[in-house]
Amino acid sequence: MGNSHRGFESHALRMGRLVYSVIGSLDGYVDDAEGGFAWAMPDEEVHAYVNDLMRPIGTHLYGRRLYAVMAGWQTLGTSPDESAVTRDFGELWRGADKVVYSTTLDEVSTPRTRLERSFDPDAVRALVAASDRDVLLGGPGLAEHALRAGLVDEIGVVVAPVVVGGGTAYLPDGLRLDLRLLEERRFANGFAALRYAVVG
């Protein structure tokens, strides 16, 4: 693998696509059997790469649990004592719209956020088509709905150098997709990034 800035530049020029991007283990999980994901925490180099992937994103799609985690970025990354990479991510997150899918939440706690009761593939397709920026899927649950509906244009995985043996899989069982490699990159801490276009 090698660094591919050209891969990111071509990504940044393609707008209005639905992207699914995760940090996961080599054996395909976003968390382990106990729900832990400390092993997936990026260092500064990986975090900077994730920030670059965020720059074309105009809207985030979340389920309830991931939204509860990510909502912390409304205040995280706002202190001058935090690293430049952390502040950059916070600014990118706060600058994007969010859609939260939940049947149990009564309200959302962050600006630029709306609540939807169900994931409607036709509505998501229309959202992406009307957007001049990319839309990012957050979490395997929403991703399964979108993948099975044929909505996803790109899948990105930052692979952590760990095998966890079980947990929440980032791809659903029984799904077959043909992919085209867009970018591969490796990092000093042993993480590796892969981005694929969904072609069929």
Question: What is each of the regions a protein language model found here?
Answer:
Residues 11-200:
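Enzymes that bind and transform nitrogen-containing heteroaromatic metabolites
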